[in-house]
Amino acid sequence: MSSSEAEVDISVVSSPEPSPLGAAARDSPLLARSPARSADGSSPPATPTHRSNTPNTAAGTPTTSASGGNHFHHSPSGGAVPPAVLHHHLQHHLSSLGSHPVALHHALHTFGHLHPAHGATHPALLQHALTPTGQQQQQQLQVQQQHQQSHVERLSPPMKSPERNGGDEVQGHSLNNNNSKALNHNNTCASAAAAAAAAAVAAANLSNNSNDSNGSSGGGGGKSTTGSNGFTSFSISSILSRSEPAKKNGAAGLITPIPQLPQPGAGGPQDAAMLSRLGFISQWGALAGRYAALCPPGWPWAPQRLPFHSPTHDSSSTNTTENPPSPTSMSPNNNNNNSNTTASSNQASKSPSHHPLHPLYHPLGSQQQQQQQQQHQQHPQQQQHPQQQQQQHPHQPTTPTSSSSSGGGSSLTHHPHPHLTGSHGGYLLPSSSNESDEEGEEIIEEDDGTDGPSDSSSPHGDGNSKRKKKTRTVFSRAQVFQLESTFDLKRYLSSSERAGLAASLRLTETQVKIWFQNRRNKWKRQLAAELEAANMANMAHAAQRLVRVPVLYHDGTTAGFVPPPPPHHHPMQYYAAARNTSPPRPPLSSLV
């Protein structure tokens, strides 16, 4: 075995971090049956000599490889991946990572991707690595036959997903995260459906602990080694530690995409591999944002290409879907604030009702969540602001409940409008309507008049003149009766009469003046309505009279015009007498 293969085998296994499953991980089915684990919990080191022809399988029974005396090396020009090498690599990862479901996928992706030409044999190789069959020669011949195209198609984008199509079966056994479910529904290749049973068997034997997001980075060790076949063996912790995409061997250092995503286009197929691997731990909002900061703006991070939107609206999926125009907006700063506000985002990705801070606003993006974090800091200021308004108007007996409702209403209605900050958040429509409803039953020096004094123009002292809040003064029946009686006597009051009436009714002069103004406006409206009704009645009556006017002459007569008769005679008598040539006509009343 060459040094490159040894480097690939040890890259993910030699991790200084403990397994996230702890001692309980030793009870998993594949690990219990794996004899390759040593006493100290580490995997056996990969020797630089030739591999034995009898590798240990997952069942623990040594089988004789059908490859004979052939030994496999990783040459720089690229070589085939034999079943024994794949199985041995899977043994390393399963023994070191504690049979985690993410560890199995990570082991498959880390050991090197089969290229698009190998799509038909990859499920068989996976089946051989878990349950050995007697078809190893046939699989090896197929791998060697397709090896000739491996160096050409090394960086080509993949066509289908051989191991992730069994996601619907995997959901029943190992609780996969939501973003991998969304990716499973997008891939509908018919030929890739044959690998569903093998992937289901592989994942059903694993422990049901895939929600632990530390499992995918527990075996990383922060090491990223580039093999000779054009793939990159990487760990999740290496993404967090690096500052830019590492390119060690030129074009061979590019990340080969794993075949499980729909084609994002020619904008960058190498990005799809990293994003799909991040799909395993999508509840890590900070990790996804860290990689998004490293992507150039032209790479496909838009939701119409990579639908990483989970149905439960977890925090990381909303970061990738709510801000599609700017890929740089998902910087680590945004996601750090997001992770601060959502302290338990791993639990929130499975049950959105257990969201710690804001269960009502799951579909909000990262910018609005930052705005919400600022809102919690500005909330005491907004509660103090209505109290300052009360100090400006001491004659208004505003209750403390109105200020609390104003502060609460501003904190709830502030999120759909993130551009409103400070004191403007308290002046949105729900909070203002709450205040007006509570203050509507109180006697305030203001009515709905148009020319009130300056002290009753508006309770807002910050210059917000767009919407003036009008409050209505409630008068008793005795006060209204006295005011109406005075208005029937005099439409306008002098200053002395207004002062005396206000003193007798226990009102202020301003309230009496505004009431008389409103009453005069109402009286004028009533007069205008009555005049309009009278005019309409007169016009209708005039129209009726125009219709009933009698015809005094005929168009075909040769005689001259006859003057109208005296009032005591019927007009038809003289009309018929003047026309001797025409026959007599009945009176007009019989015609009408």
UniProtKB/Swiss-Prot annotation:
This is Homeobox protein Hmx. It comes from Drosophila melanogaster (Fruit fly). Residues 468-527 bind DNA. Transcription factor involved in specification of neuronal cell types. The gene is Hmx. Belongs to the HMX homeobox family. Disulfide bonds: none annotated. GO terms for biological process: cell differentiation; negative regulation of DNA-templated transcription; nervous system development; regulation of transcription by RNA polymerase II. It comes from the Eukaryota. Residues 52-70, 135-149, 173-183, 315-351, 358-405, 451-462 have a biased composition (Low complexity). Residues 1-83, 132-183, 248-269, 305-473 are annotated as: Disordered. Residues 161-171 have a biased composition (Basic and acidic residues). Its main location: nucleus. CDD domains: homeodomain (cd00086). One of its GO terms (molecular function) is DNA binding. InterPro entries: HD (IPR001356), HD_metazoa (IPR020479), HMX_Homeobox_TF (IPR051300), Homeobox_CS (IPR017970), Homeodomain-like_sf (IPR009057). Keywords: Developmental protein, Differentiation, DNA-binding, Homeobox, Neurogenesis, Nucleus, Transcription, Transcription regulation. Gene3D superfamilies: Homeodomain-like (1.10.10.60). Residues 435-450 have a biased composition (Acidic residues). When expressed in mice, Hmx is able to functionally replace both Hmx2 and Hmx3 mouse proteins. One of its GO terms (cellular component) is nucleus. It is found in: Nucleus.
